[in-house]
A protein has these predicted regions:
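C-terminal alpha-helical interaction module
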Residues: 1-324
Length: 324
């Protein structure tokens, strides 16, 4: 869990001393966009046109942020257009690595790097910042397009439609205001909320984050009691963004991040929602619980020094979801 400073790798944990024990996530640095015609997107530079086999995703199967991009890639049928490399789930003094001695870890098929930070240095030899996944890489310009998952899923949603992507709009114009509103508080209190709880180094910071987290889960349980998905009957990116956190909640966050007021399995609607999306064609293939559990329990030595992996609660993913 380190970072690059002026192109040099430093093995450093998050600094919470200056924030009252509160975890503060840094913003993504690369914010370019792939667009249908290569014109500039909402942020960043132009020049990234949607083309078959031009782009490559670097992901961790453990990471909820990277998982979003794999979901959208699958839903839009982009598996043959956008290739993927999967890092090793264990992240220690060198950050994410391309070791391939764990099932489904692929190594770096493009450059045969040992570490993900080397890819960042390929894009910017003087880069300063965290080295995170996902990374959307341009194989033509040999650079990072984006390392912001929220942006990448919107690119995959529409940019490749003219290239033969599967039909489906997960950010439709008529729902965008509602989706943006949901994304805002779900990100702050749930997606990032589990990390703010788990990485807190003061009681006050933990209490604040975990209280907000379970308040939001109760709110989501109520919303999902009214309709199948967060905005109604249409699956949107808001559902996908929430879902990747819910996948990891009972197996990891309850124990490892001390988010233990309730389990997702204790919520009728949230657990049904979790199963509903999991049982959609191809979605189960994006879920890798061995990577998830190994990453969290074995990588975060400040939280779990022994590296012992919790057994975790049982959950039947294939039980009828009772929704729709």
């Amino acid at each position: 869990m380190g970072q690059l400073i002026d192109g040099v790798w430093h093995d450093t944990w998050y600094d919470t001393k200056s924030t009252g024990g509160r975890f503060k996530r840094t913003e993504a640095v690369w914010r370019n966009w792939v667009t249908a015609d290569g014109s500039a997107g909402p942020t960043g530079n132009a020049g990234f046109a949607a083309e078959r086999d031009r782009y490559h995703l670097y992901v961790s199967l453990a990471c909820p942020w990277a998982h979003r991009t794999l979901l959208m890639r699958q839903l839009k049928g982009l598996e043959e257009m956008i290739s993927v490399s999967v890092v090793h789930p264990l992240m220690l003094e060198n950050g994410w690595t391309f070791d391939d001695d764990f099932p489904d870890a692929t190594g770096d098929s493009l450059y045969q790097n040992e570490f993900l930070y080397q890819l960042y240095l390929h894009a910017d030899p003087q880069y300063t910042g965290r080295v995170t996944v996902p990374v959307l890489w341009d194989k033509t310009q040999h650079t990072i397009v984006s390392n912001e998952s929220a942006d990448i899923i919107r690119m995959l949603n529409t940019a490749f439609d003219a290239q033969g992507a599967r039909a489906g709009d997960y950010y439709p114009p008529e729902l965008r205001d509602k989706i943006d509103e949901l994304n805002g508080w779900i990100y702050d209190t749930v997606n990032n909320g589990v990390y703010k709880s788990g990485f807190a180094t003061s009681q006050a910071a933990y209490d604040e984050s975990v209280t907000a987290l379970f308040h939001s889960l109760a709110r989501l349980e109520q919303i999902l009691g009214q309709h199948r998905y967060l905005t109604g009957d249409h699956l949107t990116e808001a559902d996908l963004r929430l879902w990747t956190t819910l996948v990891r909640f009972d197996p990891v966050y309850v124990t490892h991040f001390k988010c233990d007021r309730h389990r997702i399995s204790d919520y009728r609607n949230l657990s049904g929602f979790l199963r509903d999306i999991y049982q959609m064609p191809g979605i189960a293939d994006t879920v890798n619980l061995p990577h998830i559990r190994h990453h969290y329990y074995c990588s975060h030595k400040t939280i779990n020094p022994s590296g012992v992996i919790s057994l975790g609660p049982a959950f039947d993913w294939d039980e009828p979801h009772g929704r729709g």
